[in-house]
Amino acid sequence: MKQYLDLLKDILENGESRDDRTETGVLSSFGHQLRFNLQDGFPAVTTKKLAWKGVVSELLWFLEGSDDERRLAEIRFQKSREELTDLEKFSTIWTDNADNQGVELGYANSETVKKLGPIYGVQWRDWGGKDQIQELLEGLRSNPLGRRHILSAWNVEKIGEMALPPCHVMSQFYVSTNGRLSCQMYQRSADMFLGVPFNIASYALLLSILANILNLEPGDFVHTFGDAHIYKNSIEQAKEQITREPKKLPTLIMPNIESIEDLKNFSIDDFVLDGYESHPAIKAPMAV
């Protein structure tokens, strides 16, 4: 993960100071790329603690096609939503978006239901009646050398209805002749300190799950950035992180998965980072 730290350092030293939607302010740089070979280990950040259960629960939630933040809480905390009404204790990274932008858009918002509109999971599983995940898997099986293996969340017609428009916009999958599945993801807006380590782990996990279903080996995850930025309320935290020495990457242990539908039979505890060791957590506020 040294290349991630190098990019953090570059933005700290060379990023331009800009205003932003959240009124927090950022140091920003445009157009970068990182590449991780999953054969070298799972790309989990080690220079601070990764919120792994948060990564797994959000991806499983996306793959369900849900638009309800409280469903994410059920997956994350493994309780029914009626047991999760203490929001100080059982919030998720999407709670603030539901309570702010979701409410502004007029969506249902209570202790047990928090709608977000047609966000990632809805687009992945039901874009105008199209299940992109199933079509992606079918395409990779029937025509592995094809160049149309695309997964997109940027539904122009629905952007204004989303509590948060997609930051990770589109990904393309590629099957090598050596039987490895790779993925390149384009992220239009990247919170380099808080969000990007989470995004790297999430797409590496998605790649691993799809490879497992297809009986392929995971190959490279290529992360391409548009606006890569560090919020000004996390500059000192980023400076601390780049002083830390990366540790050995862990190995992903996961169950054998035959189909996307099989995921409902597993919990977040079935996805384990074996050998994961990290430096202590570094906390920073999330800009909403």
Predicted feature descriptions by range:
Residues 1-288:
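Terminal, non-catalytic protein-protein interaction segments that mediate quaternary/complex assembly
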